[in-house]
Amino acid sequence: MYQIYVIFKCFPGKREAFVKRVKEEGIAELVRKENGCIRYDYYFSEKDEKELLLIEEWESKKHQQVHIEQPHMAQLRSFKGDYIETTILGEFEIK
C-alpha cells in the first residue's frame, strides 16, 4: 500500500472554496473511482484556517503515478494556484 499526505497552505479565505470546487467539478469522485484508489479525503485543520490536509491511499505507487497523469488531475492543477499558496508532500509505502 502507498500513502501520501499533502498539507496545503491556502490563501486566506480560500480553503473551503478550493474543496468545494474540487467536489463541484467532480474531481474527488473521479479520483475515488480510479483503479487502485483506496482513499482520497480532505481534512480541515482546527488550529489553522489556512491549512488543508489531503490523505491519499493507493494499492501501489504505480497506481498513484498513473493517477497524477489523469485529465481530471490536470484540471485540478489548472486552478490550484488560485487557492493554494504552498504544498508540503509526505509519502510512504506499507509492505
Predicted regions and their residues:
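Short, well-ordered beta-strand segments in beta-rich or mixed alpha/beta enzyme
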Residues: Y2-K9, R39-I68
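N-terminal/domain-start segments enriched in small and hydrophobic, helix-friendly residues
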Residues: I7, F11, K20-E24, E46, ...
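Glycine-rich beta-strand-turn "strand-cap" elements at beta-sheet edges
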Residues: I38-K50, Q75-K95
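Short amphipathic alpha-helical segments
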Residues: K14-C37, H72-Q75
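Absolute protein N-terminus
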Residues: M1-Y2, K95
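Short, flexible helix/strand-to-coil boundary loops that buttress conserved ligand/catalytic motifs
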Residues: V22, H67-I68, R77-K80
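Charged, amphipathic alpha-helical interaction segments
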Residues: F11, E69-H72, E85
